[in-house]
């Protein structure tokens, strides 16, 4: 099933390779969840839901009653953003070897990546999807102002200790709001050691800048990003001026251990 409709596009395969490369590079620069969580799949466009946990009886049956075995399932969202490619500029590239501007494709890929990050960190509560920051059962520690070097270190150590005491021994990843992340590029007094390098020695699964409001420490085994369709670009048609394209993917966060996540609150 060619849901990307590429066979209908009036341009050669190497242009698709250029488009794909631009989209993947733009999205990859923003994606953090995939870098510290396991990634499973892609399993294909038809993956619309995944099951969580084990099958079990929904209630204990009476002696003369049939039992009902059931599991819980969550939906797999499809993310999509439209974009355009100028027919004239593509012709100029093919005929005259002028540079091919793929900024709209890159912008669309970035929009899809930002939405993926939102699903990973915040979920979609009205559709029963948990995120790392708001899943029921996650751990929390109190933090102080990250403008203070000691406060930042103390907060991360407290979060790691909470996870370790709960049986989650790492490796750990640390995801930070932009301001918190940028504050780590400071030297400890009388040393050449940047704080970010110090924290990377504690959070060996990586320290990442993400579009979130609170720091979070995540054990590697907290869950996985499950892919239906990985990021691709498809063809929707032409109006004679632009080729209508779209960037799409389908994914969901599967949280196996909510208690393997520790959020640092203000």
Question: Where do the PLM segments sit?
Answer:
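Long, hydrophobic, amphipathic alpha-helical segments used as structural scaffolds
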Residues: 34, 38, 116-123, 164-167, ...
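Short, catalytically relevant binding-site loops at active-site mouths
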Residues: 126-130, 138, 179-183, 214, ...
């Amino acid at each position: 099933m060619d849901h990307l409709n590429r066979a209908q596009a009036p341009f050669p395969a190497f242009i698709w390779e250029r488009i794909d490369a631009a989209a993947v590079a733009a999205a990859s620069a923003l994606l953090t969840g995939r870098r510290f969580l396991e990634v499973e799949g892609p399993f294909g466009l038809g993956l619309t839901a995944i099951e969580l946990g084990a099958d079990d009886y929904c209630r204990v049956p009476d002696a003369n009653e049939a039992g009902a075995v059931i599991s819980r399932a969550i939906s797999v969202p499809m993310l999509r953003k439209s974009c355009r490619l100028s027919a004239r500029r593509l012709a100029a590239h093919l005929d005259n070897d002028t540079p091919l501007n793929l900024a709209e494709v890159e912008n669309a890929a970035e929009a899809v990546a930002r939405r993926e990050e939102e699903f990973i960190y915040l979920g979609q509560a009205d559709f029963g999807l948990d995120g790392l920051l708001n899943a029921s059962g996650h751990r929390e520690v109190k933090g102080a102002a990250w403008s203070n070097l000691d406060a930042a270190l103390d907060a991360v150590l407290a979060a790691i200790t909470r996870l370790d005491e709960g049986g989650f021994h790492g490796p750990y990843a640390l995801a930070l709001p932009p301001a918190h992340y940028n504050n780590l590029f400071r030297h400890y007094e009388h040393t050449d050691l940047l704080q970010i390098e110090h924290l990377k020695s504690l959070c060996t699964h990586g320290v990442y800048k993400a579009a979130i409001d609170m720091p979070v420490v995540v054990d590697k085994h907290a869950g996985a990003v499950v892919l239906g369709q990985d990021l691709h670009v498809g063809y929707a048609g032409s109006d004679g001026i632009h080729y209508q394209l779209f960037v799409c993917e389908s994914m969901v966060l599967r949280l196996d251990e909510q208690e393997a996540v520790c959020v640092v609150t203000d």
